[in-house]
Amino acid sequence: DIACKGSIKELLDYQFSTNEIAAVVAERDVEWWQNRASVLTTPQLASGYFNAGFLLINIDEWNLNNISSKAIEMLRDPDWVSKITHLDQDVLNVLLNGKVKFISEKYNTRYSINYELKDKVDNPVNDDTVFIHYVGPTKPWHEWADYPVSRSFLIAKAASPWSKEDLLKPVNSNQYRYC
């Protein structure tokens, strides 16, 4: 549920530091980080917790550190599962703790299309935004998501093999309430 809106050149040129596994974008604020650190019994997360919607991964370091295997092991452990509320995001924050670099929010600008239904909306998507991360139940591939913030997705769709595919119609009461 991410659409590219800007140039990815800086990401293509990105050089990972020694032992750095990923470049990530912070999630929420310090209060949230402290909450996740406490719940996940990982005190270091109090200094930074990332959103897993966007990850620039150093594949060599990822594989060297067996991140995929360790993630699956964590998800099989009932003690960990009882703490996890944000599935892959919680797991990756624990496993990659201290091995990530926090980069600009322009690479994961989160926005819910449903905010458009409010009287006043503060849209963080701007000219600097590289990736729009569509959070919330309405996505730009839904036919009722006819808002300017959907434009980046629609441009990409028009240039894709799916250009002739219809946007999705509402199929349940939750979706109907937003159209």
Task: Indicate residue ranges for each PLM-predicted region.
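GT-A fold catalytic core of metal-dependent nucleotide-sugar glycosyltransferases
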Residues: 1-33, 49, 54-57, 65, ...
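Short, glycine/charged-enriched secondary-structure capping and boundary segments
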Residues: 10-13, 36-39, 70, 147
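A glycosyltransferase accessory/donor-loop signature
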Residues: 45-47, 51-179
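Surface-exposed acidic, glycine/proline-enriched linker/cap segments
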Residues: 29-45
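A generic local structural motif
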Residues: 8-10, 41-42, 118-119
